[in-house]
Amino acid sequence: MVNGKGPFRFIVDTGATHSTVSPRLVQALGLQPSEVPTMVLNGITGTAQVSAVTLDRLQTGDLTIDQLVAPVVWAPVMAGADGILGAAGLTGRSLSVDFQRNSVRISRGVEMAVRGAALKIHATHVAHGLMTLSMEVGGVRGLAVIDTGSERTLGNPALREALKLRTRTGTEALVTSVYGATEQIERGEIWRAPTILIDTMRINDVQVVYGDFHIFKVWEMQNTPAIIVGMDVLGTVASLGIDFKNADVYFTSSRTNTMTFTPAANLSNTMHK
């Protein structure tokens, strides 16, 4: 619900800091510009100066945010949604995503996030709700960001060079275009990644899109091997839970061979970078 009206469709994006709204929602509710009429929006591929509006109240599940200043964004990544709920708005809450039932729940407690989980991984808070996990791929250690708003899994140049993909394979990469929340379109190279290890979780047979993506600079990860784990991987598990208060991420069993991990007993273990 927005300003007591709705419901409206929002995408929960754990890789976004700001919550955003679409021009369609602004028009439907007659939202007025905020006291700060424009904001700098940082997306995967670039930055933009965009208009901003103030939501008197945003409500979903156990979450209520008052006087939310939100950038107004239209982009292909919105996928027809009315807005995006960013990680900063989930501070102190738990997120439970059930991919089998196509449902998302936000709650104050961790019960929904933990339910049925086979693996718990402790993360590190970075800023504005963003969390990173320690990972290893092809013998290279780095950082991983769980991003429910990214369609594909992305890697930065530091990881690509550390893996020496060009010299190791002796082949040329497939080239693709990567779109974000801003108008910039970035070039990406598609390489099949070695097995990605996050705690006891093994992510197999994943095509990673590597590029000099703007967001890695925003997160100050441009010099550290890093990946953004997108929905091409996350969508293979039965459910995903994130406890934003305690920085814990929970996974249930995978529905495919893409992701495997040691079950249940590992719930008592955590991993710090």
Residue ranges of predicted features:
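Pepsin/retropepsin-fold aspartyl endopeptidases
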Residues: 1-273
